[in-house]
Design a protein with these regions (language model features):
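Short acidic/histidine-centered micro-motifs embedded in hydrophobic/aromatic stretches
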Residues: 11, 30, 67
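Short secondary-structure junctions and interdomain/linker hinges
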Residues: 15, 34, 38, 58, ...
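Short intrinsically disordered terminal tails
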Residues: 1, 72-75
Length: 75
């Protein structure tokens, strides 16, 4: 199983290397730029806890939940 970090930063990039212009691309860009993000994690609670501790807003958490559902289906 690949990590959530690897999945989202790969799935939501364009062929040119930019992040897609949607809420999932925005989350992927934020995750990519965060040097402290638990990049090796495949654990939903660990990642959501990290996002909450970092002060993620409601829409960000909603996007994470939706992205996690897609990630879980594909992995």
């Amino acid at each position: 199983m690949i990590s959530f970090y690897e999945w989202i930063t790969t799935k939501y990039r364009t062929k040119s290397g930019d992040f897609k212009d949607n809420r999932f691309g925005d989350l992927a860009r934020d995750v990519y730029r965060d040097r402290n993000f638990p990049a090796a994690s495949t654990d939903k609670e660990e990642i959501s806890g990290y996002l909450r501790r970092c002060g993620a807003c409601g829409p960000c958490m909603e996007t994470f939940e939706a992205a996690w559902k897609k990630y879980a289906k594909e992995n």
